[in-house]
Design a protein with these regions (language model features):
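Conserved alpha-helical substructure of the radical SAM core
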Residues: 1-115
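Radical SAM enzyme [4Fe-4S]-AdoMet core and its adjacent flexible, acidic
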Residues: 12, 30-35, 115, 120-122, ...
């Protein structure tokens, strides 16, 4: 298996989602212009052809919406990536986790290129998490994490950082360690889509810096979960612009939307294909 890759695709296979998270950057949650199963496989072929032309190997994140809302198509696509896309070296699934059944876990265990499953958590307690994702979601997500870990999957957790949960990050890291989560990352809240009505959740520059300085410090101490630092903020935390990496949008990464529109980045809505 190829260990390192030259390129990255974030592939949104659907806008449909079973949640309506209050910070979500999506606005539309319907199937309008969603690609068919056959078209998804054609896109996979186009990706493989492009990577071969560039002489690149790629990783991919398969997401939505919620990808498990079309799980039959998802599993067909993953099997196709396994058997027909040599240049896509490995992939992750980004999900809220709550639609994954025992049968799905058995299916997922057959995919050799599946590197990790990323689920979302917004806080270390039912109150802090469910306030964003809906009543009862915290219990469903923690149960999903436990089940995935018990079956040998590498699990990462992504948290959207807001004024509401920024002081809860230390407790969340502790909880994730107890759950055996392998990786943890923070994403800054951007008041777009559903989140546009909650613009007051946005952190100030000073608050952002303080949290990421804390994450940088903790990354040297906390082993479980491994803290994935937001690369473009290294310079923010160190005042050294030579540390870290520049944004990869359009350089070593692309986003594919459910209707096959190509963007440099999901947060940069400028169609380039």
């Amino acid at each position: 298996m190829v260990e390192s890759t030259d390129f990255y695709f974030q592939w949104h296979i659907t806008n449909v989602c079973n949640n309506r998270c209050k910070h979500c950057y999506h606005e539309d949650y319907d199937k309008k212009n969603e690609l068919s199963r056959e078209q998804l496989l054609q896109i996979a072929d186009h990706i493989e052809d492009a990577l071969e032309k560039w002489d690149f190997y790629s990783s991919a994140s398969i997401t939505g919406g919620e990808p498990f809302t079309r799980k039959e198509d998802l599993f067909v696509l993953l099997r196709y990536l396994e058997n027909h896309c040599e240049r896509i070296a490995h992939y992750d699934i980004l999900t809220n986790g709550i639609l994954i059944t025992d049968k799905d876990i058995s299916t997922l265990q057959t995919y050799k290129k599946l590197r990790r499953i990323q689920v979302s958590m917004e806080g270390p307690t039912p109150a802090s998490h469910d306030a964003v994702r809906g009543d009862g979601d915290f219990l469903k997500v923690t149960n999903a994490i436990k089940k995935l870990k018990a079956n040998g999957f590498v699990v990462s957790v992504m948290t959207t950082l807001t004024k509401n949960n920024m002081e809860l990050i230390p407790d969340l890291i502790q909880l994730l360690g107890e759950l055996g989560v392998d990786y943890f990352a923070l994403e800054r809240f951007m008041p777009e889509g559903q989140g546009g009505s909650n613009a007051d959740w946005t952190l100030s520059k000073e608050e952002t810096r303080r949290i990421f300085e804390y994450m940088t410090e903790q990354a040297l101490q906390v082993k479980v979960p491994h803290l994935l630092l937001y690369r473009t903020l290294y310079c923010l935390c160190s005042d050294d612009v030579t540390v870290g990496a520049m944004c990869s949008a359009g350089v070593s990464a692309l986003t594919i939307l459910p209707d096959a529109t190509i963007l440099p980045c999901r947060r940069l809505p400028i169609p380039i294909g």
